[in-house]
Each structure stands twice: as structure tokens, then as C-alpha cells.
Amino acid sequence: MHLTDNKKHTLKKGDFVISLCGHDKGSIFVVLDTEQNYVIVCDGKNRKSDKRKRKKFSHVRFLNLHTDVIDKVPSYAVDANVRREIKRLKAELAQE
């Protein structure tokens, strides 16, 4: 897996992260936005773009991968495209 240290990377919209803490530990998310000490994420399934999850930077790990799907699709299609991108990423990681 392509894990990096969050302290060396500034998370931005479209980055893939994996949850390190909480009931969603091990889940893959896409970054929608960042706040002062928090990252706003969604997975398109349990946490949709309209019910975003707020996680501390220290509770996620950057996967060194990025998607432009957030900016390229209309807002009503974000969740379906996020699910598709996460599914594709999981398939790639399973092959490694």
C-alpha cells in the first residue's frame, strides 16, 4: 500500500485517505475539504457528500493517490463516482 506520513503531505481535495481510528478504522475515504485541524471526507456509501465525516488529521493516513472525480462531475453524481473510484482503488490494492 502507498502510505505516507501526513506531516510531510498537505491533504487536498480528491486525495485518498484511510481511517486509522474510530468505528470506520481501515475504511478508505476521499477528501472533500480541509479545516484547521480536520479533514472532511466521504466514501459515497456510508458517508455521502451531503453527510460528510469530519476526522482529525492524525486519525487518517494519506494513500499517496489522488482523484479528480470531485471536480469533474456535477454535485449530484459525486457519491456514485466516489464509490466507483474507491472500488477501483481496492481492486488495485488487492492485486499488489
Predicted features by range, described:
Residues M1-K13, L20-C21, V30-E96:
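Ferredoxin-like alpha/beta domains used as RNA- or RNAP-binding modules
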